[in-house]
């Protein structure tokens, strides 16, 4: 059996394939570590499912109001138990991660309240939600104030400035775990726990919310294990396991989640309404698969960092650093390299492989964005995908891979496109 010939048939030259195999030879220890975390988290998910006696009746579809939806309600108990929280809201009516965060913020902030980000600027799409960039129905328009404390030059937390902001009166602290389209490191759960503990020492009543997108099941603990009052994420990222076609979750304190449910539906209705529309099998099975799917994506990210760092590109995290989310940032230095990289990811896809991604003015962003994603679920970033804003330092953000072998093919194809365009040579730097 000649695997190299299969790669050749898909458009990978022997030189690029051999380069990848040389990189891969040094990653066995890293991959074993990723597998150990996945094994732990797999047991955690199975334990939560068994505790809540998941059975075939929980897969039944509901329509209309969705009253007495046993599958939906039990899934929320599974999430709450797995993430060690009092309550959970897990719904297909939450359309994306930004929507989930908007629900959580608007449900728990009233006119005159103050929102604090102690980790610098939020993800691009949240700028309009908060009102940093003007938008109708933003938190600012409803009278919610916003404060921001930037990170120190070494990306540490500016504790004196955070303390000063908190003593000025803050209702809710929002902590973005992942880097988004920034080039800072992703925070570990331990770092987030330290920040939460600090905030609670200053003001025990402050609500600490963590944007957990891209981070679920990367470590053996979650921010909710270290004091987060709410954790928020998307089901078309890690916890959906590549099977959930839509959805988001909010896990946390019962009173806070109750308010989120009222905001998502209506006061007085809360979690009692919201039909599952036949999505329960995908939601349950996706959550079951999530630890191993996340492990595949992590292997792809580690492989990408080692490939591109060897070629002289700055990678965040670098090739040796521990992982706290599934995103790999590679600073490519030019728009042409970004486009070629993304064309490679697209060409390696099982869906829309014939399409050429091009930069476009994507809603919610202040610069053109290029996105490559030959995905079964539109916008799914647990599936192999790459994207980034067309602005210096021309960094592309690679994530996902339902299987490790698809992630590997995508990275090799991205390199192949760069080599073919004369933008990269296979010489170690």
Predicted regions and their residues:
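Generic structural marker for isolated residues within well-ordered, non-membrane alpha-helices
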Residues: 76
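Conserved PLP-enzyme active-site core in the AAT-like
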Residues: 3-24, 28, 35, 45-51, ...
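Acidic, PIN/NYN-like endoribonuclease modules and their adjacent C-terminal/linker elements
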Residues: 38-42
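Short glycine-rich or small-residue beta-strand-to-loop segments that form or flank ligand, phosphate
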Residues: 58, 62-63, 89-92, 326-331
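Conserved C-terminal alpha-helix-loop-beta "cap" of PLP-dependent enzymes
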Residues: 309-428
């Amino acid at each position: 059996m000649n695997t190299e010939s299969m790669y050749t048939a898909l458009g990978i030259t022997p030189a690029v394939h051999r380069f990848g195999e040389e990189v891969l030879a040094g990653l066995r220890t890293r991959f074993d570590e990723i597998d150990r975390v996945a094994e732990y988290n797999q047991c955690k998910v199975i334990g939560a499912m068994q505790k809540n006696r998941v059975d075939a009746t929980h897969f039944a579809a509901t329509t209309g109001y969705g009253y007495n939806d046993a599958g939906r309600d039990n899934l929320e108990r599974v999430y709450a138990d797995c993430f060690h929280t009092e309550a959970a809201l897990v719904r297909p009516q939450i359309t994306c991660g930004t929507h989930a965060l908007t629900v959580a913020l608007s449900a728990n902030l009233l006119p005159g309240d103050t929102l604090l980000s102690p980790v610098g600027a939020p993800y691009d799409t949240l700028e309009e939600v908060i009102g940093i960039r003007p938008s109708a129905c933003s938190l600012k328009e409803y009278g919610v104030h916003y404060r921001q404390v930037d990170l120190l030059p070494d990306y540490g937390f500016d504790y004196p400035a955070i303390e000063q902001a908190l003593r000025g009166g803050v209702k809710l602290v929002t902590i973005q775990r992942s880097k988004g389209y920034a080039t800072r490191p992703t925070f570990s759960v331990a770092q987030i726990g330290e920040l939460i503990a600090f905030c609670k020492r200053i003001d025990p009543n402050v609500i600490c919310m963590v944007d957990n997108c891209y981070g679920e099941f990367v470590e053996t603990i979650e921010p909710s294990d270290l004091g987060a009052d709410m954790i928020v994420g998307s089901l078309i990222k890690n916890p959906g396991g590549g099977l959930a076609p839509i959805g988001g979750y909010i896990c946390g304190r019962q009173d806070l989640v109750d308010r989120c449910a009222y905001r998502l539906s209506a006061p007085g209705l809360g979690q009692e309404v919201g039909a599952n529309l036949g999505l329960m099998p995908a939601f349950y099975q996706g959550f079951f698969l999530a630890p191993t799917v996340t492990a595949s994506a992590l292997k792809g990210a580690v492989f990408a960092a080692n490939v591109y760092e060897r070629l002289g590109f700055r990678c965040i995290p670098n090739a040796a650093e521990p992982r706290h989310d599934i995103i790999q940032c590679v600073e490519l230095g030019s728009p042409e390299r970004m486009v070629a990289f993304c064309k490679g990811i697209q060409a390696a896809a099982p869906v829309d492989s014939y399409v050429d991604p091009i930069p476009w003015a994507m809603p919610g962003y202040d610069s053109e964005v290029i996105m490559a994603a030959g995905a079964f679920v539109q916008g799914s970033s647990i599936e192999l995908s790459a994207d980034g804003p067309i602005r210096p330092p021309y960094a592309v953000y690679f994530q996902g891979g339902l299987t490790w072998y698809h992630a590997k093919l995508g990275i090799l194809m991205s390199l192949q496109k760069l080599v073919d365009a004369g933008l990269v040579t296979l010489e170690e730097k």
